[in-house]
Amino acid sequence: MASSRVVLILSISMVLLSSVAIATDHIVGDDKGWTVDFDYTQWAQDKVFRVGDNLVFNYDPARHNVFKVNGTLFQSCTFPPKNEALSTGKDIIQLKTEGRKWYVCGVADHCSARQMKLVITVLAEGAPAPSPPPSSDAHSVVSSLFGVVMAIMVAIAVIFA
C-alpha cells in the first residue's frame, strides 16, 4: 500500500514538473508572423520566455529578414553587416542565455518607421514567471483559492489513504 502511494506521489510530481521542463516555441507575431506595422511590444507583453525556448520568425524572405542586435543598435535601428541577417523566412532562434534580447528587420525603413522590432527578456530555465498585475476580479481570486484548497486536499488524501 505504501509503495503505491509513493508511485502516485512521484507520478503527480512528474506531471507537474514536466510542464516546467518543456521548451516552448514562440511564433513571433502569432498568425501575423514577422511583418510591418505590428505591435511586437504588445505581442511579447503576456509571454514568458525562458532559456531553452525558441523564437520562430515566419515571414516572406523576399520582403524581410531578421537581425539579432544589441540594445544600442535596436534603439537606433542600425544593423550589422547584411551577411549576418537571418533570411530563410522560417528562422528559429534558440534562447540559450537569460537577459534582454533584441531583434529587428533590416529591410528599408521596416525597423525605424514600420515597427518591425522585438525586445524580450529571457528568464533562467527554472525561474518563476513574473507576477501578473493584480486583478480586481473576485472570480479569479476564488478560482485560485479553490485550486490551492483542492491541491491540499488531494495531497492529504494521498498521504493518509
Curated annotation (Swiss-Prot):
Transmembrane segments: 141-161
Cysteine disulfide partners in this protein: 77-111
UniProt keyword RNA-binding present: no
Membrane found in the keyword field: yes
Database matches in InterPro entries: Cupredoxin, Phytocyanin-like, Phytocyanin_dom
Alphabetized Gene3D superfamilies for the sequence: Cupredoxins - blue copper proteins
GO biological process terms held by the UniProt record: response to symbiotic fungus
Localization: Membrane
Gene Ontology molecular function: electron transfer activity; metal ion binding
Binding site for Cu cation: 64, 105, 110, 116
Span of the signal peptide: 1-23
Induction (UniProt): Accumulates in roots, in a RAM1-dependent manner, during colonization by arbuscular mycorrhizal (AM) fungi (e.g. Glomus versiforme and G.intraradices); the expression level correlates tightly with AM development.
Domain Phytocyanin: 24-124
A single cellular component GO annotation: plasma membrane
SUPFAM superfamilies reported for this sequence: Cupredoxins
Positions annotated with a glycan in the UniProt record: 70
Topology of this chain in the membrane: Single-pass type I membrane protein
Record key words, sorted: Copper, Disulfide bond, Electron transport, Glycoprotein, Membrane, Metal-binding, Signal, Transmembrane, Transmembrane helix, Transport
Name of the molecule in the record: Blue copper protein 1a
Gene name of the record: BCP1A
